[in-house]
A protein has these predicted regions:
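Mobile-element integrase/transposase regions
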Residues: 49, 77, 81-82, 86, ...
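Residue-level signal for the short linker/turn that defines the boundary of a DNA-recognition helix
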Residues: 4-6, 66, 83, 260
Length: 333
């Protein structure tokens, strides 16, 4: 424009709306040519005294509430401020205020099995109770931890040391261990830590249920030379083997959950126990039945499969090579 151009000509040449040029000129005269701070001024913005009230309540109640959500309700509960939890969180972040995290319990360490407990069948048993609510019954199941054989079960309306004693007595009799257990306990030398001490007949693994840790159960186990091993509280993975068995029973035989007659439940559990031990291939022990593993046939069956797979591969290779040699070669004159 200093060169004689009019404002309209200059705007047309610069492809600039004349209205915008007028606005810039007015802002220059007012000393506001520099860009203002971006963003508007929301009408619902929190007031300065409200932010101060939030920070004050934080100082007083942070150790009690430990959450911006609770602090937002604490403010209205005390009549100090009324705003949303997100607003409280934003004000605290801008004020560099943070809640102190709650102290976390230390991580527990799983207790290993004792060294004398061999990883062979009839050395480590695991047991637990599961519920069938349709008939209001509790089933205590004992499983061999190594072979995964379902040893025995007891259906009862109670969960006491009596059921534990009866179930273990039946399992020891079925496995032919009861007389040996009584004889070993009668020597009075069952002490794996002593130099001349005898090892317990087996290790019984369980959770910390009242019937498992009771004095009567402990006395019964001592009389039969059975050592006890308990998992960590509230840690069902320490008893994953028996938890898996309970889940498998209810998942693969779901009709058991609908039985309302305890006598029918007992009969059906006997049928399911036979199918589980003798028919169903168990993935956890290499796809053999628990009876196979418990009676020592498991490794032979697994080796026979490996040998059969290798033999079948060689047979397929030989067959395909022979068929290829029988085909005429079009390139041969």
């Amino acid at each position: 424009m200093q060169g004689g151009w009019s404002q309209r000509q200059a705007c047309r040449q610069l492809d600039l709306p004349e209205r915008r040029a007028n606005r810039w000129l007015r802002r220059r005269e007012a000393g506001r040519l520099a860009d203002a701070k971006p963003g508007g001024s929301p009408m619902h913005a929190i007031l300065e005294q409200e932010a101060e009230a939030i920070l004050a309540v934080f100082q007083e109640w942070a150790e009690v509430d430990r959450s911006h959500r609770k602090l937002a309700h604490r403010g209205s509960y005390l009549g100090r401020f009324w705003c949303s939890p997100s607003t409280v969180r934003r004000v605290l972040l801008l004020g560099d205020k943070h809640f102190r995290p709650r102290p976390q319990p230390g991580k527990s360490v799983k207790s290993p099995f004792p060294d004398w407990a061999a990883l062979v069948p009839n050395s480590i048993w695991i047991y637990d109770s599961t519920h069938f609510t349709a008939c209001s019954m509790t089933v205590l199941i004992i499983e061999d931890l190594i072979s995964r054989k379902w040893l025995t079960h007891l259906v009862s309306v109670e969960e006491t040391h009596t059921q534990v004693q009866n179930a273990f007595t039946a399992a020891l009799e079925a496995e032919g261990l009861l007389e040996n257990a009584l004889q070993r306990a009668g020597t009075g030398q069952v002490d794996p830590g002593a130099e001349d001490g005898l090892n317990p007949i087996l290790l019984a693994v369980s959770d910390n249920g009242s019937q498992m840790i009771s004095r009567d159960t402990r006395t019964f186990m001592t009389l039969l030379a059975i050592a006890q091993h308990f998992g960590r509280p509230s840690t069902p993975t320490d008893q994953a083997w028996i938890e898996s068995l309970n889940g498998t029973i209810k998942t693969e035989w779901p009709y058991l959950l609908a039985i309302t007659d305890p006598a029918v439940l007992r009969a059906e559990l006997d049928v399911v126990q036979h199918a589980y031990n003798s028919v169903r291939l168990h993935q956890g022990i290499g796809y053999v039945t628990p009876n196979d593993e418990h009676e020592g046939r498991g490794e032979a069956i697994r080796q026979a499969r490996r040998d059969g797979m290798a033999k079948a591969r060689l047979h397929r290779l030989a067959r395909h090579r022979a068929e290829r040699e029988n085909q005429p070669n079009p390139r041969t004159p």
